[in-house]
């Protein structure tokens, strides 16, 4: 009975954690113009601001496996939720640009370690339901992203019109995300219920490092890292700049936020369907291509008719952004062991986020120097081409252990 209760608590914890992994970013995107005015930011500095998420995800993502082995994944995710809460509370009232960036980094540190450990926890405690559980928390992640994009502007207006209040209120959701993990870390093993696959692990919290795996020599690992990095580039540019692109086309701030919400809410059903579908396929390349073509169509529409077809472009971008749950699913499928997934998740996500850092910076610079969205949109479309190539490589029916044996 206790084991069943802990399993349910773990599912609740995964869902609430996932709900908190994007509001810190999408709420800022909805109010970016107001934040820029309030903090006197240039376009280039705003580009730096939208590059902070992937930088923090890369930096702290590399540390996640070591922290999880030391303290247990549940304790690390719990600490991550606390960091998100603290960062969201402090950020709006931190003073100038430097304080705003520092508080954002605290929240993003918590998001980073949780990002890496989600596939690990799913593989460890739900080894026979990787697609289903990945879909569940990906759906929750998309829901949190969409809700933050949709309600931040109207909620800010309802609370008095201050962007500081509109950003800070998301700390309430983060507090809720802490609660189930506090219960989980109090249990022996500081993680969650046991599973058949976990009894052979030398650590109560997480498998020991997989020996003999040189991910730097694995085409699959690099394919996943590049695919993850390029889809993250598009996602963070979308979350940071899409409302501004629509506002430049003459669309109101509230409607621009709703358009971003439509993009994000597309991930709610698709983030559940795509992982389940991908888990049943030996090769995920066709899904990669289909999502990429949706993205290219959306960028073409944004370039030639941003206002006239705004809702259609938002829907197509939302479909394209489901490359994220697909990447998480492939991480869980491209290793035979929990220990391998730990290393592959950290490598693919941290390396991927490093790859994604220049994208938002380039968009900010191009936006400032051209005064329009044309070149940034063209750049975003260009990124999709290597993303599709990398995704096809990552989607092949092989594991990192298979590649290691072939090299030996």
Residue spans for each PLM region:
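Juxtamembrane intracellular "pre-TM" segments in multi-pass secondary transporters
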Residues: 1-4, 186-224, 408
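Helix-loop-helix hairpin linking two adjacent transmembrane segments in secondary transporters
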Residues: 128-129, 136-189
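Extracytoplasmic gate region of multi-pass secondary transporters
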Residues: 28-29, 219-262, 267-269
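Helix-breaking motifs and short loop linkers at transmembrane-helix boundaries and internal kinks
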Residues: 40, 72, 93-98, 127, ...
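Conserved MFS/SLC helix-loop-helix module at the cytosolic interface between two early adjacent transmembrane helices
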Residues: 59-98
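Cytoplasmic helix-loop-helix junction between adjacent transmembrane helices
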Residues: 103-141
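C-terminal transmembrane helical hairpin of 12-TM major facilitator-type secondary transporters
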Residues: 284-327
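A late C-terminal transmembrane helix in Major Facilitator Superfamily
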Residues: 335-373, 380
